[in-house]
């Protein structure tokens, strides 16, 4: 179910403050965050945000095509290595 249009998109306050501060200084640096639920808004375009995936922070460069998506969509948490190999030969 999508978020109601009456409400604004969710962005963590600490993340929003860091973005605004960097925009006023016109500086670019990596912003570290654990807030995977935050929505990408147009003021974040051009920044690099390191998003936590449960083990490490993955740096993601924000482009205009990412606006409206959540930060967590761009840092995968599970590394699928394939199904277990069939070992019927070893059982015989």
Swiss-Prot record:
It comes from the Eukaryota. One of its GO terms (cellular component) is mitochondrial small ribosomal subunit. One of its GO terms (biological process) is ribosomal small subunit assembly. InterPro entries: Ribosomal_uS19 (IPR002222), Ribosomal_uS19_bac-type (IPR005732), Ribosomal_uS19_CS (IPR020934), Ribosomal_uS19_SF (IPR023575). Protein S19 forms a complex with S13 that binds strongly to the 16S ribosomal RNA. NCBIfam families: rpsS_bact. PANTHER family: RIBOSOMAL PROTEIN S19P FAMILY MEMBER (PTHR11880), SMALL RIBOSOMAL SUBUNIT PROTEIN US19M (PTHR11880:SF8). Belongs to the universal ribosomal protein uS19 family. One of its GO terms (molecular function) is rRNA binding. It comes from Eucalyptus globulus subsp. globulus. This is Small ribosomal subunit protein uS19c. Keywords: Chloroplast, Plastid, Ribonucleoprotein, Ribosomal protein, RNA-binding, rRNA-binding. Its main location: plastid.
